[in-house]
Amino acid sequence: MGKNNSGSRNEVLVRGAEQALDQMKYEIAQEFGVQLGADTTARSNGSVGGEITKRLVAMAEQQLGGRANR
C-alpha cells in the first residue's frame, strides 16, 4: 500500500463525498441514539461505522444490479 502523508488511511476518492458521508454518519448515530465523540465507547462509535458500511454496500449493490438488468 502507498504511504498517505495525512496520517489517515481514509481517503475520499470522490469529490464532495466527504460531506455526504459525514451527514450519513450523524443521521445513523441519531437513529442509534449514539452521541459521537471522544467520550463515546469504541463499540458505540464502531456500530455507526459498521452501519455506514452496510448501507454503502447496499447502495452499490443496487446500482450494480440496475446496470446488470439494462
Swiss-Prot record:
Pfam families given in the database record: SASP
Keywords on record: DNA-binding, Sporulation
Domain of life: Bacteria
Cross-referenced PROSITE patterns: SASP_1, SASP_2
Site (Cleavage): E27, I28
Gene Ontology process terms (BP): DNA topological change; sporulation resulting in formation of a cellular spore
Parts forming coiled coils: none
Any one GO molecular function term: double-stranded DNA binding
Task performed by this protein: SASP are bound to spore DNA. They are double-stranded DNA-binding proteins that cause DNA to change to an a-like conformation. They protect the DNA backbone from chemical and enzymatic cleavage and are thus involved in dormant spore's high resistance to UV light.
Similarity field: Belongs to the alpha/beta-type SASP family.
Note: SASP are degraded in the first minutes of spore germination and provide amino acids for both new protein synthesis and metabolism.
PANTHER family found in the cross-reference section: SMALL, ACID-SOLUBLE SPORE PROTEIN A
Protein name in UniProt: Small, acid-soluble spore protein 1
Organism of provenance: Bacillus cereus
